[in-house]
Design a protein with these regions (language model features):
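A short glycine-rich beta-strand->turn/loop micro-motif centered on a GG-aromatic cluster
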Residues: 118-132, 174-179
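A conserved segment at the C-terminal end of the G1
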Residues: 110-113, 159-171
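Conserved NTP phosphate-binding and transfer environment spanning the P-loop NTPase/kinase superfamily
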Residues: 237-244, 248-369
């Protein structure tokens, strides 16, 4: 007897998702590219062109003809998946399947899998219900978080400090990794496009589900837009109301760090000029020409220092009043090399733990303590 097909609630927890061997999104590649459950694979039962053709038949001829043509294509595509991606799956393989509404596309694959003998599950309501669950999570989970913002001028290695803290066991939320962007004018990653807004939100939802209630979570100060990605309103509100630890560093240390951290741009200076053109409304033609001259001469230390002092630092100062009102302490860097970053991470972890337990702590930590 074929095993029954199980219907799964769209608000399935991350822990329950891990109980399945494979999460299969049977929607078209274009639908999958816009958003999907993180970790899912795309085994479409109709590709983009086929889906469009069946939709046209449905509207211009009649639903019966469309369903018959669609069923033939779905059967062919599922057969192709069984002969390729799924050919080595064992008897006890447990897939979780979803389509747009949890109807015909996922149902067709689940029925065939069940007839084979696989215990298949389908997300009730499909992606549409899953998306509502994500939006609900992004609305209410941030209100339960205990965030600690790590702020500081551009070039103070905040992202590296957070990742060093994570390696030491501190819980963090790395928005720049999720957004595939460093959150500044020169923050785009060459050859690595940003995710769609929806997929960013799906990833963030999973991260938030892993946050333990009452646990202090470190997160880098960001604007409400990271590249093309918008930080969800409730999460942004939680960030704006969270206490802050500020990182300071000498200008020369910041310049040296940025030259190392943005080596991909130093090696490809042609990538920088189109980005600088976005500053025409903020800086004079004379200043832009001076920056271009530094780039042409590959005078990276002077270029970086000038960009910091003329553009980034004034922008940071303009946002200072609200940030200072929430500031709970300062950690002072010296060199921003590997060892210094690790010491800063430990100092921030100590300060954050002290604040969380309401213990008195010094207002400043030196990175070499």
């Amino acid at each position: 007897m074929a095993p029954p097909i199980t219907r799964i609630s769209p608000d399935i927890s991350l822990a329950d998702l891990h109980k399945f061997d494979t999460i299969i999104d049977v929607r078209s590649p274009a639908e999958f590219a816009d958003d999907h459950i993180p970790g899912a694979i795309n085994l479409p039962v109709l590709n983009d062109q086929q889906r469009a053709e069946i939709g046209t038949i449905y509207k211009q001829i009649n639903p019966f003809t469309a369903k018959r043509a669609g069923a033939a294509l779905v059967a062919q595509n599922i057969a192709a998946h069984l002969q390729s991606s799924l050919q080595d799956k064992p008897r006890d393989w447990r897939p979780l399947i979803y389509c747009w509404r949890g109807g015909q596309r996922s149902g067709a694959m689940a029925q065939i899998f069940s007839n084979i003998g696989w215990h298949s599950s389908v997300i009730d309501g499909g992606y549409k219900s899953y998306r509502r669950h994500v939006l609900d999570c992004l609305d209410h989970l941030p209100k339960q978080l205990s965030l600690m913002i790590v702020s500081g001028q551009t070039g103070t290695a905040k992202t590296h400090i957070l990742r060093a803290a994570s390696a030491k066991g501190a819980p963090i939320i790395d928005l720049e990794r999720l957004a595939c962007h460093r959150g500044s004018l020169l923050g785009s990653e060459p050859g690595q496009p940003q995710p769609t807004q929806r997929y960013f939100e799906s990833q963030l939802c999973q991260v938030l589900q892993q946050c333990a209630p009452g646990q202090t979570i470190l997160i880098e100060a960001e604007s409400n837009k990271i590249g093309n990605i918008h930080v969800p309103p409730a999460f942004w509100a939680a960030m704006r109301n969270a206490p802050t630890i500020r990182v300071t560093a000498p200008i020369d240390a910041r310049v040296n760090f940025l030259q190392r951290d943005y080596a991909h741009m130093v090696n490809q200076p042609e990538f920088i000029m189109p980005l600088l053109s976005k500053l025409t409304h903020r800086h004079s033609a004379k200043q832009l020409a001076a920056w271009k001259d530094m780039i042409d001469r590959k005078d990276w230390p002077d270029f970086i220092k000038s960009l910091l002092e003329t553009h980034y630092d004034p922008s940071y100062q303009r946002s200072g009043s609200a940030r200072l009102a929430r500031e709970t302490g300062v950690v002072a860097a010296t060199t921003l090399d590997h060892d210094d970053i690790n010491r800063l991470a430990e100092a921030i972890m100590s300060k954050s733990a002290s604040i969380a337990t309401n213990k008195p702590a010094a207002d400043s930590f030196k990175s070499d303590l």
